[in-house]
């Protein structure tokens, strides 16, 4: 599977501390096996839990597109 990142996701990863970067990288690489859940009301949208963070992504044709990485409290307010 190929993984692509949005500008928002890259910005968040670059601003995160080393431990958070490592946890995000490991979780994203294991997306099919991770704690993922399909988001209701949005086609092809999923979320991955990484501690208190939520990785919002979509999957199409063996491509995983990481759309955003945000804290849990903000993740569900925006939907």
Describe the residue ranges of each PLM region:
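Enriched for short, Lys/Arg-rich terminal
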Residues: 2-3, 19, 50-53, 58-79
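Residues that form or immediately flank small-molecule/cofactor binding pockets and catalytic motifs
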Residues: 8, 41-44, 71
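A short, surface-exposed loop/turn module that caps and links secondary-structure elements
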Residues: 22-48, 76
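Short amphipathic alpha-helical/adjacent loop interface patches that line ligand
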Residues: 13, 17, 28, 32, ...
């Amino acid at each position: 599977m190929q993984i692509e990142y949005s500008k928002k996701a890259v910005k968040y990863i670059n601003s995160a501390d080393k431990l958070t970067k490592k946890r995000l990288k490991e979780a994203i690489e294991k997306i099919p096996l991770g704690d993922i859940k399909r988001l209701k009301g949005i086609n092809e949208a999923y979320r991955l839990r990484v501690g208190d963070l939520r990785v919002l992504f979509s999957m199409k044709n063996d491509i995983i597109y990481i759309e955003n990485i945000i804290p849990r409290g903000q993740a569900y307010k925006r939907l």
